[in-house]
UniProtKB/Swiss-Prot annotation:
Modified residues (N6,N6-dimethyllysine): 585
Any single GO BP term: positive regulation of cell migration
PROSITE patterns listed in its UniProt record: ER_TARGET (PS00014), HSP70_1 (PS00297), HSP70_2 (PS00329), HSP70_3 (PS01036)
Name listed for the protein in its UniProt record: Endoplasmic reticulum chaperone BiP
Modified residue annotations for Phosphothreonine: 518, 643, 648
Phosphoserine found at: 86, 649
Gene (UniProt): HSPA5
Keyword Protein transport (UniProt): no
Region annotated Interdomain linker, chain positions: 409-419
NCBIfam families on file: PRK00290.1
Enzyme class, broadest EC rank: hydrolase
Classification lineage: Eukaryota, Metazoa, Chordata, Craniata, Vertebrata
UniProt record similarity statement: Belongs to the heat shock protein 70 family.
Protein source organism: Ictidomys tridecemlineatus
In-chain residues carrying the UniProt-annotated modification O-AMP-threonine: 518
């Protein structure tokens, strides 16, 4: 494997060098852009090192916001975000949550409930409708909004370099599907940029990390939790060669979701205290959004933050305190959910926790102390690397890759190998999924297979292209269909039809079928015309495949879940009975409540050894819901102590 990988890398290098020699004069300086959900960042490889470029406000990260003022002026970046509260209906953000998705996508429908601007359906896609001044309304595709942000990043780089920029490397979440990648490339084109590469954000972060650590083989886990997306990737770095071994994540989890939970909490609280529903006033909601985000940032370094808003709603002021403990309680399920993709990535790459050499935290949300604690505990106390600014790491890596494409000699022999997230194949007789490219195969890649006709004198074969992990195509996702016609009459099994799958560096799939006898060919390119899978569907398919492949895995999971509940209950019981721990700190009323809840669960366990996984989880959740408020109240702003939950709930067997 290693020899073939190195050989492939050398070939890639030679080809890339030769190709880039031809292009070098055309491309000029290639920039690296991290096009984020909430913030974007641009970097360039110059004089042997990466420069992250500050914008006209002196900030190294720029809000991914676009606004249209009543006077007809368009604002991008800081200026747009700064007037959000006074002009919420015409200030557009979160375009990355909509890009490459269809109108009916459940996540789009969920999102538009919370966005202050109008999202409408057009050509089965979500479009953004704003007032552009002078009483005129206009609709924009998400790609156009992203293009405006990319234009801002392009201008930022041009001001710094003193020359035109025409080529870029742009990053996307590893779990972005084909339609989302294609739409991101389109946004670049609209912005006047030739997007030479779309690379995965965690991969870019690992490049940033790996530049100065090239000796020997290392397993790197990149945990990337940003404003709107979450990605986990496992990479191996071997003497400058990067290979993405596995990826997982959620394109719909990030800092904004944490903000949303806090906002909903305060909106309910305000309604309870005053009887008034703030949701009716878009401006008040956006004021709250801005202040909640500030408070969240403050809680990364302090234990409580005040939220003060003058003339918040109907002339009344708003004044509340948010403690770190409350912030964590409101988001605990979301925080914990970040561990599942970490576990999945380890399983997919056949590695144990102890095999991970470095953990890299990327994205502003990894500054949250609880997230850092959960990651550290999951890896049995291993400290994550802190050498990279989490906001800039992705742009840094993109700039290094841009340096490689510019033909910059100082990047050395850096090579980047990405993977496809799902198995790709064709349907053969009986509805069988014949796999050509297994999931987690390094891309770019090309695989061919010879098939034949199923009946005598068959003049046409239909090639159906699928992605998914199940053995039958009916359970997988159809990407596209095409026919190869004009096959000369022959007995079944005689014609030789060569089917070739080719995935390029941007993860875009081309399928070709050729009749070897006549040289007759046909092909299909799977781009965003066909709606590719959502990450939820990808996850469901992978889970389904595993579930149907081995029922005993389900049994093991049931046992693990039962053990989790049992360990949690007994750990609490021991702590309640220990005067040095919880026992000495609880009021008699709280102690009685907790003891009763714990005993109930222990008794239930004894009589329900064969209950379902869901039952065990539900019982654990019930217990958590009783225990956590008591612990939070007890420890107030200092945050809860370890209640045994942290020790047990992530105790995965590998």
């Amino acid at each position: 494997m290693k020899l073939s990988l190195v050989a492939a890398v050398l070939l890639l290098l030679c080809a890339a060098r030769a190709e880039e020699e031809d292009k070098k004069e055309d491309v000029g300086t290639v920039v690296g852009i991290d096009l984020g959900t909430t913030y974007s960042c641009v970097g360039v490889f110059k004089n042997g090192r990466v420069e992250i470029i500050a914008n006209d406000q002196g900030n190294r990260i720029t809000p991914s916001y676009v606004a249209f003022t009543p006077e007809g002026e368009r604002l991008i970046g800081d200026a747009a975000k700064n007037q959000l509260t006074s002009n919420p209906e015409n200030t557009v953000f979160d375009a990355k949550r909509l890009i490459g998705r269809t109108w009916n996508d459940p996540s789009v429908q969920q999102d538009i409930k919370f966005l202050p601007f109008k999202v409408v359906e057009k050509k089965t896609k979500p479009y953004i409708q704003v007032d552009i001044g002078g009483g005129q309304t206009k609709t924009f595709a998400p790609e156009e909004i992203s293009a405006m942000v990319l234009t801002k990043m392009k201008e930022t780089a041009e001001a710094y370099l003193g020359k035109k920029v025409t080529h870029a490397v742009v990053t996307v979440p590893a779990y972005f599907n084909d339609a989302q990648r294609q739409a991101t490339k389109d946004a670049g084109t609209i912005a006047g940029l030739n997007v030479m590469r779309i690379i995965n954000e965690p991969t870019a972060a690992a490049i940033a990390y790996g530049l100065d650590k090239r000796e020997g083989e290392k397993n790197i886990l990149v945990f990337d939790l940003g404003g709107g997306t979450f990605d986990v990737s496992l990479l191996t770095i071997d003497n400058g060669v990067f290979e993405v071994v596995a990826t997982n994540g959620d394109t719909h989890l990030g800092g904004e979701d944490f903000d949303q939970r806090v906002m909903e909490h305060f909106i309910k609280l305000y309604k309870k205290k005053t009887g008034k529903d703030v949701r009716k006033d878009n401006r008040a909601v956006q004021k709250l959004r801005r202040e909640v985000e500030k408070a969240k940032r403050a809680l990364s370094s302090q234990h409580q933050a005040r939220i003060e808003i003058e003339s918040f709603y109907e002339g009344e002021d708003f004044s509340e305190t948010l403690t770190r403990a409350k912030f964590e309680e409101l988001n605990m399920d979301l925080f914990r959910s970040t561990m599942k993709p970490v576990q999945k990535v380890l399983e997919d790459s056949d590695l144990k926790k102890s095999d991970i050499d470095e953990i890299v935290l990327v994205g502003g949300s990894t500054r949250i102390p609880k997230i850092q604690q959960l990651v550290k505990e999951f890896f049995n106390g291993k400290e994550p690397s802190r050498g990279i600014n989490p906001d800039e790491a992705v742009a840094y890596g993109a700039a290094v890759q841009a340096g490689v494409l510019s033909g910059d000699q100082d990047t050395g022999d850096l090579v980047l190998l990405d993977v496809c997230p799902l198995t790709l194949g064709i349907e053969t007789v009986g509805g069988v999924m014949t796999k050509l490219i297994p999931r987690n195969t390094v891309v770019p890649t090309k695989k061919s297979q010879i098939s034949s006709t199923a009946s005598d004198n068959q003049p046409t074969v239909t090639i159906k292209v699928y992605e998914g992990e199940r053995p039958l195509t009916k359970d997988n996702h159809l990407l596209g269909t095409f026919d190869l016609t004009g096959i000369p009459p022959a007995p079944r099994g005689v014609p030789q039809i060569e089917v070739t799958f080719e995935i390029d560096v941007n993860g875009i799939l081309r399928v070709t079928a050729e009749d070897k006898g006549t040289g007759n060919k046909n092909k299909i390119t799977i781009t965003n015309d066909q709606n590719r899978l959502t990450p939820e569907e990808i996850e469901r398919m992978v889970n389904d495949a595993e579930k149907f492949a081995e029922e005993d895995k389900r049994l093991k999971e049931r046992i693990d879940t039962r053990n989790e509940l049992e360990s949690y209950a007994y750990s609490l019981k021991n702590q309640i009975g220990d005067k040095e721990k919880l026992g000495g700190k609880l009021s008699s009323e709280d102690k009685e409540t907790m003891e009763k809840a714990v005993e109930e669960k222990i008794e239930w366990l004894e009589s329900h050894q064969d209950a379902d996984i869901e039952d065990f989880k539900a019982k654990k959740k019930e217990l958590e819901e009783i225990v956590q408020p008591i612990i939070s109240k007890l420890y107030g702003s200092a945050g809860p102590p370890p209640t045994g939950e942290e020790d047990t709930s992530e105790r995965d067997e590998l």
